[in-house]
């Protein structure tokens, strides 16, 4: 069985293929570092990190790009609230905490980690191209993408443009200037004192979605294999990305697979700073080992919404301890023994089924139980360790955050 992944675009699970043989190009939407990151962010990045590790283990050279949205409304708002504190200072402080959290969770560092403010030139170039091609228009220094000029707008969400017009649109800024309700900003004029850059349309700053398009194309080219992000980004952000990327570059599809992780809530309620219910990964890692938190996150299917309840990690302690202890059984033995090959094959079969990490962990749980009961072989112990390493567990010898290309292991 070959790897099959579910793509939001088309609502189907199909065989994973890439633009360039043997190479997988992944772009995952990163954070806006106006505040510290919470458990929901950790859920997303651990899931995509594990997929990246699996692709490497089966022979792909993975080019993984994750951006930083370091200029947007939220960054400006926080700067104002903090008495005009410089945005780069806010960004660097929160980004440092974020990177440290992911390092402790053994998340591999991206192949490229671009900041939006480093790509203003490319953003302006894409915007100018979209105007030239008739997909964008200028109104008093603001530049809008005209959604109706892209006939497939709505395809990612499986609806027509008319149906999307009935939805609440988070990109409703400057509505009085728009030709159509779904049109969105590519470039915008700014209030006095806010960060701005020179452009053919006057001083301003980028819109939200064009930033990701410019960074993805700059680092991975006009076509990629996997675009990842939270399910809350499907509309309008990812819908906009498809439209502007394919219209600007002339290449399609922009991404072969669109993968969206579910939302992690706190006891049924969305985590948000305004509600004061953020669960911070760094706080949990003061009480529990980072690998135990990683196990908790991978015990939920990446596409499913999940609820975090206080006490969940504590209840996971026995399972974590069993896997950790069993992974030391038969150390140094060859996983090529028949029992080891069988375990690896069963593990791969579950991951190949739309990256089903929870079922893969069940398979490894069963192997751990056999080993601890004295019914497993040394080869199975080594195979267990290899599989746990592919899932990114440091206790099993997984490569650390600073590792580059991992190479084949399974």
Give, region by region, the residue ranges found by the protein language model:
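Alpha-helical recognition segments enriched in aromatics with Gly/Pro capping
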Residues: 1-34, 49, 121-329
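N-terminal, positively charged nucleic-acid-binding surface of large information/translation enzymes
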Residues: 10-13, 19-106
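Short, well-structured beta-strand/strand-turn elements
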Residues: 61-63, 134-140, 371
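The substrate-binding groove and active-site-proximal loops of carbohydrate-active enzymes
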Residues: 78-87, 111-117, 230
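Structural preference for alpha-helix termini/caps and helix-kink/transition segments
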Residues: 270-272, 277-410
């Amino acid at each position: 069985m070959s790897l099959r992944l579910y793509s939001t675009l088309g609502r189907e699970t199909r065989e994973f293929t890439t633009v360039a043989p043997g190479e997988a190009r992944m772009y995952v939407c990163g954070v806006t570092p106006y505040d510290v990151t919470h458990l929901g962010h950790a859920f997303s990045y651990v899931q995509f990190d594990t997929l990246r590790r699996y692709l490497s283990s089966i022979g792909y050279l993975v080019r993984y790009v994750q951006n930083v949205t370091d200029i947007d409304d939220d960054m400006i708002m926080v700067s104002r609230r903090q008495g005009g504190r410089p945005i780069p200072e806010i960004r660097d402080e929160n980004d440092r905490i974020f990177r440290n959290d992911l390092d402790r969770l053994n998340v591999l560092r991206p192949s490229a980690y671009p900041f939006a403010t480093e790509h203003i030139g490319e953003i302006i170039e894409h915007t100018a191209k979209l105007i030239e091609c008739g997909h964008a228009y200028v109104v008093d220094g603001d530049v809008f993408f005209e959604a109706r000029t892209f006939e497939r707008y709505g395809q990612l969400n499986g609806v027509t443009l008319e149906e999307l017009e009935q939805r609440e649109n988070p990109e409703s800024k400057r509505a009085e200037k728009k030709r159509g309700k779904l049109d969105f900003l590519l470039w915008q004029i700014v209030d006095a004192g806010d960060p701005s850059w020179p452009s053919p349309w006057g001083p301003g700053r980028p819109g939200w979605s064009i930033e990701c398009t410019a960074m993805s194309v700059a680092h991975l080219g006009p076509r990629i294999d996997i675009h990842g992000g939270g399910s809350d980004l499907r509309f309008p952000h990812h819908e906009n990305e498809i439209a502007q990327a394919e219209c600007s570059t002339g290449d399609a599809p922009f991404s072969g697979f669109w993968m969206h992780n579910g939302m992690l809530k706190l006891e049924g309620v969305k985590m948000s700073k305004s509600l004061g219910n953020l669960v911070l990964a760094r706080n949990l890692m003061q009480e529990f080992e980072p690998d135990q938190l990683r196990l908790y996150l991978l015990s939920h299917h990446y596409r499913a919404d999940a609820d975090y309840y206080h006490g969940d990690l504590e209840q996971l302690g026995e399972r974590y301890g069993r896997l950790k202890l069993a992974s030391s059984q038969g150390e140094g033995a060859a996983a090529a023994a028949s029992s080891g090959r069988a375990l690896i094959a069963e593990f791969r079969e579950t991951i190949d089924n739309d990256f089903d990490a929870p079922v893969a962990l069940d398979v490894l749980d069963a192997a751990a139980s056999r080993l601890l009961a004295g019914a497993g072989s040394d080869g199975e112990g080594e195979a267990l360790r290899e599989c746990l390493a592919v899932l990114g567990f440091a206790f099993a010898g997984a490569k650390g955050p600073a590792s580059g290309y991992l190479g084949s292991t399974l």
